[in-house]
Design a protein with these regions (language model features):
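Short, ordered, surface-exposed loop/turn motifs in non-cytosolic proteins
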Residues: 89-112
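Short, acidic Ser/Thr/Gly-rich low-complexity loop/linker segments typical of extracellular
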Residues: 104-133
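A short, Gly/Thr-enriched small/hydrophobic beta-strand-prone motif that recurs across taxa
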Residues: 75-86
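A short, solvent-exposed beta-strand micro-motif common in secreted/extracellular proteins
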Residues: 127, 131-159
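Glycine-rich beta-solenoid repeat tracts in large extracellular/virion proteins
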Residues: 1-6, 23-29, 43-53, 65-75
């Protein structure tokens, strides 16, 4: 599948692309494209090739084993952030203040942390949302974007750093 500069702002969704003689998907001078829930495998050159000033492209739920990103392009991998707060006995904790930072970007904050997002519900959860967790920025080696979560209940605050696997 070849996506070029004419094809900006595209959504490529629910495809299985494998066993090709060349590439699975190529983004060539293509910007603001979303790859949703695709499976790319066993393509001879690369499963995914991002090239020639392709920027602001995102992949969500897309699996691949090989990628090429040239020195003028980028791809950000996003994932769903799911939070479940429980006490030491495993019971759900409702009404807990939450703050989620994606590197230096505030993604979620309830009132204690100066935001307007809801505290945890009766299940100890907040609404699921997307976060950026890996970027291929002008290279084929991924850089992990740190996610930090702060949790506050009455008289304690805990800060957690998440490692994406």
């Amino acid at each position: 599948m070849y996506i070029d500069s004419v094809d900006n702002d595209c959504k490529v969704e629910d495809n299985t692309i494998g066993n090709n003689d060349e590439y699975g998907i190529v983004l060539h001078s293509a910007n603001y494209n979303y790859l949703w829930n695709n499976t790319l495998y066993s393509n001879d050159l690369k499963d995914l090739q991002i090239e020639t000033q392709s920027s602001s492209n995102f992949a969500i739920g897309t699996t691949f084993s090989s990628i090429g990103v040239d020195g003028s392009s980028d791809l950000t991998i996003r994932e769903y952030f799911v939070l479940d707060v429980n006490d030491a006995s495993g019971n759900n904790m409702s009404g807990i203040d939450i703050k989620v930072m994606e590197d230096d970007t505030l993604k979620y904050a309830s009132s204690y942390f100066g935001g307007g997002d809801p505290k945890t519900d009766s299940y100890g959860t907040v609404e699921t949302f997307l976060i950026d967790y890996v970027i291929y920025d002008r290279e084929s080696t991924p850089t992990t974007i740190p996610t930090n979560v702060s949790v506050r209940s009455h008289d304690w605050v805990e800060i957690l750093s998440l490692i994406h696997i």
